[in-house]
């Protein structure tokens, strides 16, 4: 072996200690290529035609020292994570221009580099856009002084609320409705304000909604997107399994949240894909119970629905299990029914079929399953039979948001669709609610259950609970009972 001189050792040490070696380029993503973003923008050009433009707002900057998260659709089209950014797509010449704020040197010194108008050459290399300009030039470009001669007649912009974190569009729309009905608030949405500004400043444009087109694009996931969702699902599943291991009577709901969060951050998540739902006993009856303040009781079930925000994508996995590690007879009857229903739904998912066809075929199978079955109480029998008519077992798309944009119900399924299968039953008189949730990927030949590795069979669930979890290794100040 050749002798390594002290000079080479010193040179290597200086190299690994240098900022260029030690730090990754945190200011730009590494999952998608220039061609990925260009292909997405090309679909918009194709759709809007040559007598229209599209303007897409990025997310606003955040107050305080908070990690910025771009709005989903802006990230989808550019990969840029700078606040107050705008993208102009000119259908006349199929050119794309990014408008960015000027550099804030003081903030960069304190927080690290953020792409700005001064980085125009770098941004073009990273994103593949044709031009990068400072934000103040957007108005001049919209009146036709430079990019648009003569001015385009139609301006497309997203009018649906953009997701920027743990909230999905359905939740944002509900929040907007509550704000609008508040006589002391009533503020319009950011999208509505933007539309109003365009109307007042540039009345020559007919404004149309770009959201439906973006929704249809995001509905069908590329192979790269699928791999990120797969990783998000793996992290979600490992987090739930860690919570299973940490479960015993006396453990608090929030402690299961902590166990899962540790796994999330350990594996590169930047936060929650949505607020965790962790409910023991009757708390599980509330579909989006988020308080997580109660101790788990012996004899109860605990439901956990949780997934991370991983590289701008998430997942949606739910499991329910016995706090004491063993299903009792009544719990077992209902739980086995739900698992069988999940399997029946997956059996019929494939390209070309609709959600209603899947639901009808699975319900027919479950009616056969129920022949000769008896349950501990008549109310249980009634619940499972009535549940066969419920259409919500086939749920929602999953992707950049947990309740992602696009439609999977009422349309033929296509390869690349990712959505949840979520069989559930309610026993009202006991406030007993049981469900599990898995992530389905439609493939060319059928379907893949992306969360199949997360224990759902009774013996697998009970075996996992017996294993030691984080709470047993790191006992919290509010120490739970020992296993």
Regions from the language model: what does each represent?
Residues 1-9:
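Bacterial N-terminal signal peptides that target proteins for export
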């Amino acid at each position: 072996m050749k002798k390594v001189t002290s000079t080479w050792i010193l040179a290597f040490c200086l190299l690994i200690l240098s900022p260029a070696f030690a730090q990754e380029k945190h200011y730009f993503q590494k999952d998608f290529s220039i061609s990925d973003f260009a292909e997405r923008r090309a679909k918009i050009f194709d759709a809007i035609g040559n007598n229209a433009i599209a303007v897409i707002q990025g997310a606003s900057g955040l107050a305080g020292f908070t990690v910025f998260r771009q709005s989903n659709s802006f990230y989808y089209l550019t990969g840029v994570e700078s606040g107050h950014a705008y993208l102009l797509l000119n259908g006349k010449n199929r050119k794309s221009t990014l408008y960015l704020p000027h550099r804030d040197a003081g903030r960069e010194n304190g927080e690290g580099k953020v792409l700005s108008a001064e980085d125009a050459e770098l941004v073009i290399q990273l994103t593949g856009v044709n031009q990068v300009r400072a934000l103040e030039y957007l108005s001049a470009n919209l009146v036709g002084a430079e990019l648009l001669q003569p001015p385009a007649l139609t301006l497309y912009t997203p009018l649906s609320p953009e997701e920027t974190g743990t909230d999905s569009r359905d939740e944002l729309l509900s929040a907007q409705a509550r704000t609008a009905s508040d006589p002391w608030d009533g503020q319009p949405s950011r999208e509505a304000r933007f539309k109003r500004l365009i109307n007042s400043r540039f009345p020559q444009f007919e404004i149309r909604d770009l959201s439906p087109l973006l929704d249809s694009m995001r509905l069908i996931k590329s192979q790269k997107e699928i791999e990120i969702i797969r990783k998000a699902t793996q992290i979600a599943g490992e987090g739930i399994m860690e919570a299973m291991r940490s479960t015993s009577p006396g453990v608090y709901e929030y402690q299961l949240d902590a166990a899962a969060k540790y796994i999330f951050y350990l594996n590169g998540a930047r936060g929650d894909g949505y607020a965790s739902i962790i409910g023991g006993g009757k708390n599980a009856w509330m579909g989006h119970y988020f308080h997580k303040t109660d101790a788990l009781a012996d004899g109860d079930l605990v439901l956990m629905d949780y997934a991370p925000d991983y590289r701008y994508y998430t997942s949606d996995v739910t499991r329910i299990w016995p706090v004491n590690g063993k299903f009792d007879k009544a719990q077992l009857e209902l739980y086995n029914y739900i698992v069988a229903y999940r399997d029946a739904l997956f059996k019929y998912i494939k390209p070309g079929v609709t959600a209603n066809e899947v639901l009808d075929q699975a319900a027919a199978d479950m009616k056969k399953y129920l022949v000769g079955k008896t349950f501990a109480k008549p109310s249980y029998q009634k619940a499972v039979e009535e549940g066969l008519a419920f259409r919500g077992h086939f749920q929602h798309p999953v992707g950049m948001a947990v309740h992602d944009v696009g439609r999977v119900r009422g349309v033929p399924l296509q390869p690349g669709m990712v959505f949840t299968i979520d069989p559930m039953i309610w026993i009202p008189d006991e406030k007993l609610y049981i469900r599990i949730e898995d992530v389905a990927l439609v493939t060319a030949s059928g379907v893949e259950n992306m969360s199949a590795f997360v224990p759902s069979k009774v013996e697998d669930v009970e075996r996992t609970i017996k294993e030691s979890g984080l709470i047993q290794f790191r006992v919290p100040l509010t120490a739970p009972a020992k296993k």
